[in-house]
Amino acid sequence: MYQNHKSEILLATPLIKDDIVFTKSVVYLCQNDRHGAMGLIINKPLADTLKDVFEELHIPHTNTFKEILEYPLYMGGPISPHKIMILHTTNGRNYTSTIKLDEGLAITASIDILEDIANNILPEYFLPVVGYSCWTANQLTDEIKSNDWIVTNKLNKKILFNHENKVKWQNHLEHAGYTLQSLDTLFNRNTGNC
């Protein structure tokens, strides 16, 4: 039976292993309906930074804060791996291509938000991602039933947007009420170090 998980967090379980994209992934679900789901992986930083994006798109950035220039891009998923989007808190600014989500979050795929960021006009929280993850109708429901994913509606923006990527999966698990030991018991295997 279909269940809407929009604006919830998916946490890959130890059953997803040896998958370069989804092993120990934390996914924020932007859309979820009877036709399928779309989400962004938020804990897999890439080597590319916002500075690389500004240079590629010829966005002036001489006055951009250094920490912004060094901000990593995140692999949002395997679909459209060259499309950049910004997951961010709403800040009262209207951008050309913004989809408002729940919990005061939005996703923007237009250049105007990148220009704002280059000018140090920043949302409270933001995460630049390239690509996205997608599930067809019933695919995500089936994967959840197969215990590939833990779903949590315990959204914490500080955890969602922090840069402690090596422990973000574990932090979300703990925020959802799980421990590595409870996963070991649940899945009767060693989950390994995060």
UniProtKB/Swiss-Prot annotation:
Any one Gene Ontology cellular component term annotated for this protein: cytosol
Pfam families for this protein: DUF179 (PF02622)
InterPro entries cross-referenced by the UniProt entry: AlgH-like
PANTHER family: UNCHARACTERIZED PROTEIN YQGE, UPF0301 PROTEIN YQGE
Similarity-based family: Belongs to the UPF0301 (AlgH) family.
Protein's UniProt name: UPF0301 protein FTL_1216
Organism: Francisella tularensis subsp. holarctica (strain LVS)
